[in-house]
Amino acid sequence: PSTVVIADAEQMKKVINNIISNSVKYMDKPNGRIDIRILDRDDSIQIEIEDNGKGIAQKDLTRIFERFYRTDASRNSAQGGSGIGLSIVKKIIEDHGGYIWATAKEGEGTCMHFVLRKYAELS
Protein backbone atom coordinates (compact mmCIF):
# COMPACT_ATOMS: atom_id res chain seq x y z
CA PRO A 1 0.00 0.00 0.00
CA SER A 2 0.97 3.61 -0.56
CA THR A 3 1.08 6.07 2.29
CA VAL A 4 -0.54 9.46 1.79
CA VAL A 5 0.26 12.58 3.78
CA ILE A 6 -1.75 15.71 3.05
CA ALA A 7 0.54 18.72 3.18
CA ASP A 8 1.19 21.99 1.39
CA ALA A 9 3.91 21.06 -1.11
CA GLU A 10 5.51 24.52 -1.09
CA GLN A 11 5.64 24.57 2.69
CA MET A 12 7.18 21.10 2.81
CA LYS A 13 9.80 22.22 0.27
CA LYS A 14 10.66 25.08 2.63
CA VAL A 15 11.08 22.63 5.50
CA ILE A 16 13.33 20.24 3.56
CA ASN A 17 15.33 23.04 1.91
CA ASN A 18 15.91 24.84 5.21
CA ILE A 19 17.11 21.74 7.02
CA ILE A 20 19.40 20.68 4.17
CA SER A 21 20.69 24.24 3.78
CA ASN A 22 21.62 24.30 7.48
CA SER A 23 23.38 20.95 7.11
CA VAL A 24 25.44 22.28 4.22
CA LYS A 25 26.07 25.65 5.89
CA TYR A 26 27.58 24.09 9.01
CA MET A 27 29.37 21.21 7.32
CA ASP A 28 33.00 21.38 8.32
CA LYS A 29 34.26 18.21 6.65
CA PRO A 30 35.44 17.65 3.08
CA ASN A 31 33.63 14.29 3.05
CA GLY A 32 30.29 15.72 4.19
CA ARG A 33 27.20 13.54 3.99
CA ILE A 34 23.47 14.15 4.31
CA ASP A 35 21.13 11.17 4.62
CA ILE A 36 17.34 11.36 4.31
CA ARG A 37 15.15 8.58 5.67
CA ILE A 38 11.38 8.17 5.62
CA LEU A 39 10.05 5.80 8.26
CA ASP A 40 6.52 4.44 7.98
CA ARG A 41 4.76 4.37 11.36
CA ASP A 42 1.26 3.14 12.23
CA ASP A 43 -0.55 6.47 11.86
CA SER A 44 2.28 8.74 10.73
CA ILE A 45 5.50 9.03 8.82
CA GLN A 46 8.76 10.15 10.35
CA ILE A 47 11.29 11.95 8.18
CA GLU A 48 14.90 12.15 9.31
CA ILE A 49 17.56 14.36 7.76
CA GLU A 50 20.95 13.53 9.19
CA ASP A 51 24.37 15.01 8.49
CA ASN A 52 27.88 14.27 9.64
CA GLY A 53 28.76 17.93 10.24
CA LYS A 54 29.93 19.64 13.39
CA GLY A 55 26.80 18.84 15.39
CA ILE A 56 25.00 20.88 18.02
CA ALA A 57 25.79 21.04 21.72
CA GLN A 58 23.25 19.29 23.97
CA LYS A 59 22.61 22.57 25.81
CA ASP A 60 21.44 24.15 22.54
CA LEU A 61 19.17 21.35 21.30
CA THR A 62 16.11 22.56 23.21
CA ARG A 63 16.56 26.13 21.94
CA ILE A 64 17.39 25.78 18.24
CA PHE A 65 13.72 26.09 17.24
CA GLU A 66 13.35 29.44 19.06
CA ARG A 67 13.05 32.52 16.88
CA PHE A 68 16.39 34.34 16.44
CA TYR A 69 18.31 31.77 18.48
CA ARG A 70 21.79 31.06 17.14
CA THR A 71 24.06 28.49 18.72
CA ASP A 72 27.06 30.70 18.05
CA ALA A 73 26.20 34.39 17.82
CA SER A 74 29.82 35.19 17.02
CA ARG A 75 29.80 33.23 13.73
CA ASN A 76 31.33 35.07 10.84
CA SER A 77 29.05 36.63 8.26
CA ALA A 78 30.13 34.10 5.62
CA GLN A 79 27.89 31.53 7.30
CA GLY A 80 25.00 33.97 7.37
CA GLY A 81 21.63 33.22 8.86
CA SER A 82 19.35 35.25 11.05
CA GLY A 83 18.27 32.52 13.43
CA ILE A 84 14.69 32.27 12.19
CA GLY A 85 14.91 29.32 9.79
CA LEU A 86 14.28 26.51 12.26
CA SER A 87 11.52 28.45 14.03
CA ILE A 88 9.76 28.73 10.66
CA VAL A 89 10.32 25.01 10.04
CA LYS A 90 8.80 24.19 13.44
CA LYS A 91 5.75 26.37 12.78
CA ILE A 92 5.14 24.78 9.37
CA ILE A 93 5.39 21.26 10.81
CA GLU A 94 3.09 22.13 13.73
CA ASP A 95 0.61 23.84 11.37
CA HIS A 96 0.42 20.48 9.57
CA GLY A 97 -0.36 18.68 12.85
CA GLY A 98 3.14 17.30 13.27
CA TYR A 99 6.12 17.83 15.53
CA ILE A 100 9.88 18.17 15.16
CA TRP A 101 12.97 17.60 17.28
CA ALA A 102 16.70 17.26 16.85
CA THR A 103 19.37 14.91 18.09
CA ALA A 104 23.06 15.65 17.78
CA LYS A 105 26.53 14.89 18.95
CA GLU A 106 29.17 17.59 18.80
CA GLY A 107 31.80 16.82 16.20
CA GLU A 108 29.72 14.02 14.67
CA GLY A 109 26.58 15.57 13.24
CA THR A 110 22.93 16.40 13.68
CA CYS A 111 19.68 14.64 12.85
CA MET A 112 16.42 16.54 12.41
CA HIS A 113 13.37 14.33 12.91
CA PHE A 114 9.82 15.33 12.09
CA VAL A 115 6.55 13.47 12.12
CA LEU A 116 3.48 14.04 9.97
CA ARG A 117 0.18 12.21 10.25
CA LYS A 118 -0.96 9.88 7.52
CA TYR A 119 -4.08 10.78 5.66
CA ALA A 120 -4.86 7.32 4.32
CA GLU A 121 -3.35 4.19 2.92
CA LEU A 122 -4.12 3.39 -0.68
CA SER A 123 -3.99 -0.15 -2.06
What positions do the PLM features span?
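Short helix-loop "hinge" at the ATP-lid/N-box region of the Bergerat-fold HATPase_c
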Residues: S23-V24
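Conserved micro-motifs of the catalytic ATP-binding
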Residues: V4-A7
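Short conserved segment of the HATPase_c
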Residues: I56-F68
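Short beta-strand/loop element within the Bergerat-fold HATPase_c
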Residues: R33-D43
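Conserved glycine-rich
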Residues: G97-G98
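Acidic ATP/Mg2+-coordinating residue in the GHKL
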Residues: D51
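Short alpha-helical Gxxx[C/S/T] motif in the catalytic ATP-binding
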Residues: G85, V89
